[in-house]
Amino acid sequence: VAVKKIMKPFSTPVLAKRTYRELKLLKHLKHENVISLSDIFISPLEDIYFVTELLGTDLHRLLTSRPLEKQFIQYFLYQIMRGLKYVHSAGVVHRDLKPSNILVNENCDLKICDFGLARIQDPQMTGYVSTRYYRAPEIMLTWQKYDVEVDIWSAGCIFAEMLEGKPLFPGKDHVNQFSIITELLGTPPDDVINTIASEN
């Protein structure tokens, strides 16, 4: 088993909400490509411990150790998308999909983990989401109106990183991130830009 320690989860309202949300989601999400929660306990110091299955490494460590062969890339991407399909069908947006939140065992079985930033789908979302390299443009432009597509964008960024061996959009900040995206993908046509509404 693996044990995830959350120190002082009740020290702030934000941390308490995040811990509760992750616990609630892990309790209900049951899929072979999503980490499963087997137990939970609280220490006398009020630290919380999530007990999950043990997988040997994460995708980030694999990517930094050696290039991946194409058949592994295909199998990993298949499992990521399969796990996301299940998570999304449950009405959940992960919001922080990145290689270090994807666990892998010695049989190349893959599981999505770390649901601390995940949310039930809602017309009004919050802006604090996803590690910058894997952040969808709509979060940068209209951070309150996004949906499961942001996880698909992140999965695409992870796919490109598996192929290239490095992050596709390694932005230093929001502006640089968006600049790198438009340099690679081009500027959207005016009719697309005109459909983007921002309340920021």
From Swiss-Prot:
User: Record's InterPro entries?
Assistant: Kinase-like_dom_sf, MAP_kinase, MAP_kinase_CS, Prot_kinase_dom, Ser/Thr_kinase_AS
How is the activity of this protein regulated? Activated by tyrosine and threonine phosphorylation.
Q: Kindly list the cysteine pairs connected by disulfide bridges.
A: none
Q: What is its main location?
A: cytoplasm
Q: How is it modified after translation?
A: Dually phosphorylated on Thr-126 and Tyr-128, which activates the enzyme.
In what residue span(s) does the Protein kinase domain sit? 1-200
Q: Which residues form the active site?
A: 96
**Where does it reside?**
Cytoplasm; Nucleus
Which positions does the record annotate as the modified residue Phosphotyrosine?
128
Q: Name one GO molecular function term.
A: ATP binding
Q: Which reaction does it catalyse?
A: L-seryl-[protein] + ATP = O-phospho-L-seryl-[protein] + ADP + H(+); L-threonyl-[protein] + ATP = O-phospho-L-threonyl-[protein] + ADP + H(+)
Question: Broadest EC class?
Answer: transferase
Required co-factor(s) are: Mg(2+)
Q: Give residues where Phosphothreonine occurs.
A: 126
What does this protein do, in the record's words?
Proline-directed serine/threonine-protein kinase involved in a signal transduction pathway that is activated by changes in the osmolarity of the extracellular environment. Controls osmotic regulation of transcription of target genes.
What does the sequence similarity comment in the record state about its family? Belongs to the protein kinase superfamily. Ser/Thr protein kinase family. MAP kinase subfamily. HOG1 sub-subfamily.
- This one is known as Mitogen-activated protein kinase HOG1
